[in-house]
UniProtKB/Swiss-Prot annotation:
InterPro entries for the chain: SAICAR_synt/ADE2_N, SAICAR_synthase_Vibrio-typ
UniProt superkingdom: Bacteria
The protein, known as: Phosphoribosylaminoimidazole-succinocarboxamide synthase
Pathway recorded for this protein: Purine metabolism; IMP biosynthesis via de novo pathway; 5-amino-1-(5-phospho-D-ribosyl)imidazole-4-carboxamide from 5-amino-1-(5-phospho-D-ribosyl)imidazole-4-carboxylate: step 1/2
Family assignment from sequence similarity: Belongs to the SAICAR synthetase family.
Classification via HAMAP family: SAICAR_synth (MF_00137)
GO MF entries: ATP binding; phosphoribosylaminoimidazolesuccinocarboxamide synthase activity
Amino acid sequence: MNLADKVLVVNDNLPIRTDKPVHSGKVRSVYWLTEEDSARLIKDKGYDVPADAPLAIMVISDRISAFDCVWQGENGLNGVPGKGTALNAISNHWFKLFKDKGLADSHILDIPHPLVWIVQKARPVMIEAIARQYITGSMWRSYTKGEREFCGITIPEGLEKDQKLPELLITPSTKGVLTGLEGVPEADDVNVSRSDIERHVKGFNFSNESDIDLYEKLLKEGFDVISDALAEHDQIFVDTKFEFGYVNDAAGNEKLIYMDEVGTPDSSRIWDGSSHRDGKIIEQSKEGFRQWLLNHFPDPDILLNKNRMVERFALASDNKLPESVMMDISNTYVGIAEKIIGKKLHISDNPKQEIIDILRDEYQLIV
């Protein structure tokens, strides 16, 4: 079988029964189930949600995005083998660990296939919850330009690149474009301070002000759980992005949960510990791919300058990346996933047909 056949690139054309448009993101597609199918699954599977809760099928692809663009490889390899399976396996592992340690639930109700989640519809908090343990990446670039205040927090002089910070920093940004919030620019992914959030509790979609403390607590505790677990494999949890939302349980009680994905190579930086001690940075995350892109193209400003998005999209669509680069990404993702979960990943030879078969035979969701 051709290597490209093992990659799930298009994930928004599955014959899943739905009466709403399929939502397609950079990597995941969401199929909202009909009221009848949601109610049937809640009853038949015993999900801990209200009987009338909306459910969705979330299918992850093997596409690779960076700098807000989706990138493709040569020889028809338009995704990264095993990437989606690795991301879901890692998130599943951390979500279970969070729950086992009494932190909070996630939006995932069922895992029919390594590339598929059944999820409960959540009301998202409009914050990208970012935690940083080291100064690197965009934060370091800003620091070298003289910035010392990040999201209302002042950091000390004299820090060096890739140095561990004195304490874990919470540097949130907006999730999407928020309008009408005094002091918050109307643009995507804008840094905000704790005081910004406190001034606009409802604007950021929090139910009450005390949940600002709760989200920070869950972010810090989740970060520590992952950091401690990775340290056992001599891996360093550098920084990460979490997302939060609200759902109701079967009794109708509202709760704040983790959602999207957590602790993955897409949403986090992970460094190899032994290399870091030797003064070298070996990325075990998508950051390695970002650095490759910056070094590969003669004008890296296109990838960094948000005023050059038209050029950036053209760059991504006009350039097929070497197959060896796509396989390097695959090895990084699959390798770190297998370290985290402690076993080999099963990567499907025909993922699309597998998904259809399972959702038809075990969930009666295929039309």
